[in-house]
UniProtKB/Swiss-Prot annotation:
Transmembrane segments: none annotated. The modification Phosphoserine is found at residues 245, 247, 250-251, 383. This is Ribosomal RNA processing protein 1 homolog A. Disulfide bonds: none annotated. Interacts with C1QBP. Interacts with RRP1B. The lineage of its organism: Eukaryota, Metazoa, Chordata, Craniata, Vertebrata. It is found in: Nucleus, Nucleolus. GO terms for biological process: rRNA processing. Belongs to the RRP1 family. Changing residue 427 to R: Abolishes methylation by N6AMT1. Residues 253-267, 371-381 have a biased composition (Basic and acidic residues). Residues 239-252 have a biased composition (Acidic residues).
Amino acid sequence: MVSRVQLPPEIQLAQRLAGNEQVTRDRAVRKLRKYIVARTQRAAGGFTHDELLKVWKGLFYCMWMQDKPLLQEELGRTISQLVHAFQTTEAQHLFLQAFWQTMNREWTGIDRLRLDKFYMLMRMVLNESLKVLKMQGWEERQIEELLELLMTEILHPSSQAPNGVKSHFIEIFLEELTKVGAEELTADQNLKFIDPFCRIAARTKDSLVLNNITRGIFETIVEQAPLAIEDLLNELDTQDEEVASDSDESSEGGERGDALSQKRSEKPPAGSICRAEPEAGEEQAGDDRDSGGPVLQFDYEAVANRLFEMASRQSTPSQNRKRLYKVIRKLQDLAGGIFPEDEIPEKACRRLLEGRRQKKTKKQKRLLRLQQERGKGEKEPPSPGMERKRSRRRGVGADPEARAEAGEQPGTAERALLRDQPRGRGQRGARQRRRTPRPLTSARAKAANVQEPEKKKKRRE
């Protein structure tokens, strides 16, 4: 009897993760989490790169098989939170590296119906990766290691990442960083997060990557500048209010008794309805909830200097330098207190219409100039067909000068025109030959029972 080969646990879990039944897949995800915790707790334990690639193969098809939107979101959150089950930073980075390599490998096989849920999975994994840094206190070394991993697997020229993965990663990076660390990160730390993008934008020869980084990173920073400054001013006002409240607490200690007794006396009687008005602090809190959340803070002058340092190198391509210099000017204006002016839709529409009118006027002037150069105001000679139609309308003998210029005799032109014209009644301008009746003999006149022409003449006389 042949003994059955025992498969490694990673392969068994991958097979169950890619199963047809949802119950089997959910159970496999729970077992995988327990297996990761148990294996990484041991000193000699851990996963190899190949083992994690097999695990991610099963997780990829586990997400592939999930077809309900709410369940897709729940499964994506569960899969992305597996990074917290690893007990060491090296194992976490290896897990993230295997994820991005799996996405790069399988991206071209994803159809458009399943594309959105994998976009969501990428966003959730990036969010949990940044939460790992937050739990570690935003250590500089951990930040550098994670950014190096992401740049190597996604944006580096030697990476095998498709354009869809690159574009989506650049688009969501600042959004997820804002969600996780906008309340804690300083301007210097934020500069470290965007520093790899500065290097890639200055070195890359891919115009798509350059355009995505410029629009998704640098121009987003410029657009969010008013919100960032407003957020900073609100934070400073809050700190001033806290300091003022701490200083007033000591002076208000003796007056609390009188205030409490006065409030008791001003209470409405029982059974009456009193509509409370919101206080100023509550209104401010409501406005803060209605407005957007915190925004990343940047030192615009430091960002401009860093970009200028990378763009001014001799190895930087000319098109990259030209594009980055435009962004540098905007950042320098922000550092000097000049904000970019947003065009009002009415003004933009008016400017567009004026541009169209100017183009139309230029086109008309160009056509008029060409006509003047061609004939200096003279009319172009008509075509032979048009000349024939005109001659039919006015008759051949009406224009003897044109007939003389053509070198034809009057009789010849008339005969040629009559030969070309169709025979029929109602032809305008056609010359018909008059028929002269032949004189009837007496015998023929009697047979036809008509009088002779001579007798008719006598009667008419």
